[in-house]
Design a protein with these regions (language model features):
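FAD/FMN-dependent oxidoreductases across multiple families
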Residues: 186-188, 196, 206-273, 279
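N-terminal Rossmann-fold NAD(P) dinucleotide-binding loop
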Residues: 15-16
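Flavin-dependent oxidoreductases
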Residues: 164-193
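Residue-level marker for buried hydrophobic side chains located in beta-strands
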Residues: 29-30, 140, 259-262
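Glycine-rich FAD pyrophosphate-binding loop
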Residues: 23-43
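Conserved N-terminal helical subregion
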Residues: 2-6, 48-155, 159-172, 209-218
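C-terminal helical "tail/cap" subdomain of flavin- and related membrane-associated enzymes
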Residues: 1-4, 81, 228, 251, ...
């Protein structure tokens, strides 16, 4: 079967995983990254069993699993610590035969970069995307995030980043809390997960941009260990960003028979379901598999197969995450909490 060449725009999780999958299929691959170096902030990615299956098919499952921790025993709580419900992690584990896992972003990126290097894929840093026509590649993959230049070139401004009206903070505490899950208040919430021994991943969402001291005050009366996390971690290591998603949903993840989008470039979502990295990995593996099955001579058919497999699924996840965000940040917490209590144990 005739093999071809691909250029991947963006060296994030989705872009590197796509490059690995295409290279393992025998394609010549280059990765362009506009930044001069990759950021190494230490937030955690949750990986659902389906995403772990995709990593297995890419030959990366064991390496990632060795750097991850299982996620179990998480609860949804009120600010006073009252448990409202359990997250369905154990149910997912029983059905899938493996637990959801959490891995720090730097550790996941280290695995991907090591495999990219081993496969002989070049990553060209400080290189902006100038459009598909001058690349000389058979396939152009847009993995360049929510502000994707590849997406804009293919679809114009019909879908664009849209703010949801809240601000997120994320960070890593230098101790294990032993208390995991999310705590929901009025218009705001706080989450904690394991990430690696001796550390805890945390994230918070508030209605407006605030400084570090204001954030601490926002959660000062909440149950332990939330105030301690904010008091004992260095604000200079915290990351703040306005929560956005891609709206409206794209009509396709592919364009013109030679361009495909993966990850946030295709379906950027709010982080409430913790599926951003998962969907990017599923996109990457599905695209590489479709291209390998059809070959260079049937690239339009390969992209159509990829779009058929991934678009509806990923867009449903994005919609679910946005809907959950509205529910969690509700201004009527009593009604919301009452509904949560009705969830099965």
């Amino acid at each position: 079967m005739e093999r071809g060449s691909a250029i991947v725009i963006g060296a994030g999780v989705g872009g590197l995983a796509t490059a690995i999958g295409l290279r393992r299929a025998g394609w010549a691959v280059r990765v362009l990254e506009r930044r001069t170096e990759l950021e190494r902030y230490g937030t955690a990615f949750g990986l659902h069993p389906t995403a772990q299956d995709a990593l297995d098919r890419l030959g990366l499952g064991a390496a990632v699993g060795a750097r991850a921790v299982p996620y179990r025993g998480a609860r949804i709580r009120r600010p006073d610590g009252t448990v409202l419900a359990a997250l369905p992690l154990e149910r997912i584990e029983r059905r899938a035969g493996r637990p959801e896992i959490l891995v720090s972003r730097p550790r996941l990126m280290d695995v991907l970069l090591a495999e990219v290097d081993r496969c002989g894929v070049s990553v060209e840093y400080g290189t902006a995307f100038g459009g598909p026509d001058g690349t000389g590649a058979d396939l152009v993959v847009g993995a360049d995030g929510i502000n994707s230049a590849v997406r804009t070139g293919a679809f114009g401004e019909r879908s664009a980043p849209r703010e949801v009206g809240t601000v997120a903070w994320i960070g890593i505490a230098g101790f294990e809390t032993g208390v995991y899950g999310e705590t929901w208040g009025r218009g705001r919430f706080f989450g904690m997960t394991p990430v690696e021994p001796g550390r805890t991943n945390w994230y918070a969402t508030v209605p407006e941009a605030t400084g570090a001291e204001e954030l601490r005050e926002s959660f000062a009366g909440w149950h332990d260990p939330i105030p301690r996390i904010l008091a004992e971690t260095d604000p200079s290591t915290w990351i703040r960003y306005r929560m956005r998603h891609l709206y409206p949903a794209l009509p396709a993840f592919v364009h013109g028979g030679r361009t495909a989008l993966v990850g946030d470039a295709a379906h950027a979502m709010t982080p409430n379901l913790g599926q951003g990295a998962c969907t990017a990995l599923l996109d990457a593996e599905a695209l590489a598999r479709a291209v390998a099955a059809h070959g260079r001579g049937a690239l339009p058919a390969a992209l159509a197969a990829y779009d058929a497999e991934r678009r509806r699924s990923a867009q449903w996840v994005a919609l679910g995450s946005r809907t959950l965000h509205r529910f969690v940040t509700a201004r009527r917490p009593a009604l919301r909490d009452g509904l949560v209590r009705l969830l099965p144990a």
